[in-house]
Structure formats: C-alpha cells, structure tokens
Amino acid sequence: KPGSGAPQVVTKRCVADFAATDPLPQTIVPYMGIVQDRLAVEVLRGCARGCRFCQAGMTYRPVRERPRAQVVEAAERGLAITGYDEVSLTSLSTTDHSGCAAILHQLNADLAGSGVRVSIPSQRLDSFGVEMAAEVGGARRGGLTFAPEAGSQRLRDVINKNVSEEDIELAARNAFEAGWRRVKLYFMMGLPTETDEDVVGIASVAQRVLDIGREVVGRGYKSGVSVSISVAVFVPKTHTPFQWSAQLGRDEVIRRQRLLLASTHDRDIKVSYHDADVSLVEAVLSKMGRAGFDLVMAAWRHGCRFDAWTDQFDFQRWLDAGREVGVSLEGVASAPMSLDQRLPWDHTSPAVSKGFLKREWRRAAAGVTTADCTMESCTGCGVCPTLAVSNRIEGVRDGK
C-alpha cells in the first residue's frame, strides 16, 4: 500500500561470499529411508549458461564457486558424522565448477575402498570430457545423466542450450569408453517454436547415443548398454525469457508424446514422460500470480491434497475448482502474454532486468544464442551492478 513503507519492488538477497558459509550448517540423518538418502554438498551457487526456460538459472545468479579444498573437507566431514554411503556434489551445473575434476579425483582417492559413492546430479554435455568421465566413474557406479533438452540443433539454439551434436556424441563416447553402460537423457516437449521434426529428433538423439554405446561396448543384452529418455512438458516460468510464452495445449501434448513413442523403435531405449494434466496445472499456477489464490482454495475444498504425489493427483478436482471460480485452466496456460503488459510477478525481482529477459526472448525468436558470461564477456543481465556482486570463479572455465 502507498505510505506503508514497503518497497514497490522486492529484490532478492544474495550471499556475495559463498565460500564464507559452512557447506554443512546442520546435517540431520532421518530414521527411515528417504528419496534423497545421501549427503549433499553444494559446490557452487548460480548458473550463467542462460537456458531461456530455466527459472533457477536466472534467479540464482551470479555464479559463486566454493574453493576445492572446502568442498572436499565438507564432503569427508559430512560422511564421517552421518554414516552415509553416498555423497552428491550438488548445484545447478556441478560439472561447470572450474575444479570439478580435481574435486572428484581427490574424493575418489580419499574414499577408495570405503564403499562410498560420489555422484553428480547431472552432467553438462559440453563439459564432460575424458578426464571427467574417468573421475565420475572412479567410485561405485550408477547411471549417467545428460540433458540435451531438445531434439534438434535449431531448437537448442532457440532455448540457448549451447550444446552441439558433436558435444552430445563426444560426451556419450567418453562415458561408454570410461565403462558406463546406462545413460539417461532429459528433454522437454512443447518448447517455443517446437515442431514434429524436433519431437522425432528426440528419438534420433537417443538412438545415436545408443549406437555409440554399442560401437564401444558391443551389441546384445549382455553388454548392458541402454538409454532412457525422460521428457518433461514445458511450463512457462516467471522471471525467464520464456515467461511470455504459451503452454502447448493438453491434447497437442498428448499427440506429440504419442509421436515420440511411435518414433522410438529400439527395445534398449526406454521412454518416460510427464503427465500432461499435471503440467497443465503447473502452468496455471505459474502464470496466475495472486489471482490463483481463489483457484487454490477451491481446489483444496474439492479435496486436493499432496498433489505432487502421482497417486494423490486428481485432475478432475482441478477442473471442478476452475469451474467454481470461473477459470479455464487450459485458457490460462495456453494464453501468451504481451511483452508490454504488467505481469503478476513484476513486484518481485531476482535482479535480472526485465529488459534483458525481453532481449533474450527476441534472440530466441531469431534463433540467436547468448554466451556464458563466466567464459566470455558480460551479457548485461543486470545482476552484478544491482546487487553489487560478481561471478566468483576459483579456477579457469573453458566449457570443455
């Protein structure tokens, strides 16, 4: 309210010196098995890759790396006080840490023979070299996860993924030659400008990765080579260049999912995808802002509880709630927004300027990529001058 003393725009706070914080402020070990049943050590915060669909990549800027010695010490201290048999080096893009390979090498050496596994949530395709492949495989093995996100180079340029076909094939070869047998690939469906050709391209990328695995390891079920692809439905997220986008209609999402399944012919490629109805509700909640309060309350009255759990989600309840408050769920999700309109979340700011997001939206439409400012020049997102901070890189990043 005017005169209340509250700022018209609330800007995020930022930890400028990430290395001054304790990676393990409090580690609680549960009495039961949980989904993420492992020690987690955050090795860096922020990401400047600039994927245009990614909210975290925009809102957690700038990039701040922890020193290598601090990461190793925290991991070993955490394992000693918790008894976990796995430690995950977490961040938005762990392999982007300038000392990632050295950290893995040190942990693998120190933990040799202990039965402890060192894991990384996801690997960047263009920073997963031979050395990285060997170090990730140095401890107890699981599967490797990469995120090409789109099935064609054209669409990867639109979303600013900045990985090439060569990057994908080289990362796959490095992984298989280092002894890995299972690779998981993450994609998104319904991205702005996506066509059927891009959808079919998802299956083609998976097949190429599988073929490389068979070339390196051999064919047949005994080789153990397999590829799984997980396909999320694009949800427009606030404070991203794609916040003005429409979500693909529910029926069209289902049609494209079926097209992908029909395009995947190899039994060693497993396909899973997100529920179209869940993704529709996510888009509605993302785009409505404060106006979504009445919808959420109506959904609660209709019995919605723990809807992030698959066995609890009931789309009909959300449809009933929408009718009660006069909201068409698909109408909200599939409606594009104007670059000039005031958005429901404009009273909050991650310190990335709206002007930068608009420029990125226009560059996406033109298929023009934007470089990572930790490896090239400043892209003018506005975070550093607004918060009086800067990227803090411990070593040298070269993107490979």
Question: What are the functions of these language-model segments?
Answer:
Residues R77-S228, A232:
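Conserved SAM/AdoMet-binding glycine-rich loop
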Residues C47, C51, V71, I120, ...:
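Conserved, mostly hydrophobic/aromatic
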Residues C54, M337-K400:
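Cysteine-cluster motifs in flexible loop/terminal segments that predominantly coordinate metals
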Residues K1-A40, A351-R363, I393-D398:
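N-terminal [4Fe-4S]-dependent radical SAM core
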Residues R49, H97-G99, F128-M132, R154-I159, ...:
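Flexible glycine/acidic-rich beta-alpha junction loops that bind and position SAM and/or redox cofactors
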Residues K1-R13, R66-P67, A74, T94, ...:
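Terminal amphipathic helices with adjacent charged low-complexity linkers/tails
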Residues T27-F53, L79, I120-P121, G142, ...:
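N-terminal pre-triad scaffold of radical SAM enzymes
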Residues G33-A69, T379-V396:
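Canonical Radical SAM [4Fe-4S] cluster-binding loop centered on the CxxxCxxC motif
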